[in-house]
Amino acid sequence: MLTKVMVTGITGYIGQHCGAELLRQGYEVIGTVRSMEKADIVREGIARVAPIDNLTFCETNLLSDEGWKEAMDGCAYVLHVASPFIIANPADENEMISPAVDGTLRVLSAAKANGVNRVVLTSSLIAIIAGKLSGHYGTDSWSDPDANIGTYAKSKTLAEQAAWEFAEANDINLVVINPGGVMGPTLTGRVEGESLTMISDIINGKYP
């Protein structure tokens, strides 16, 4: 029997590459999508670089408890990649913060209920260095969510802090990675999401 891994946010750029790498290494992958309409696009993209016989999808929402525990049944590991990423600050910061923080706690709660061996959370470098010009950083380094650091940085900082607090209180094996800019080829051939759109805009001269 193959080891089963959930990848949240598999429709996103990082999530697609995570799913593809897991499939190449022989894992069974279940990817979460907000709408099953996107599943075929992701499946076709991943099929370009990895076998997809052991790839399935489930429909979940970071703002709803429904379906998370059932979808995670049988998973040994969870890669929690899903989180809203919008460069511009939204009119209501909770549009970004609630899915980031509450969604992370929903995933961790389901992981606890299912006895998942380990959760790997994709945080961000911005949760460490926002508003700082220089310095040495470690495991106790945090961006200040009360400072004027922008909504995205605030959402990633609060989400990671909430994750560590929950994991420590509930004895969950949590690993957090804090990438900076993530660049490379898109598997679907589409320019979607803030990261790829930003790169496209730079190439096309939309930034001075």
Predicted regions and their residues:
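Conserved Rossmann-fold NAD(P)-dependent oxidoreductase catalytic core, especially the SDR/UDP-sugar
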Residues: H80, P84, N89-Y152
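N-terminal Rossmann NAD(P)H-binding glycine-rich loop of SDR-like oxidoreductase domains
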Residues: T3-Y27, T32
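Conserved SDR Rossmann-fold cofactor-binding beta-strand/turn motif
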Residues: V33, S123-S124, N178-P179, M183
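Active-site Tyr-X1-5-Lys
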Residues: A147-L174
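NAD(P)H-binding glycine-rich loop region in Rossmannoid oxidoreductase-like domains
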Residues: M36-I41, A47-D102
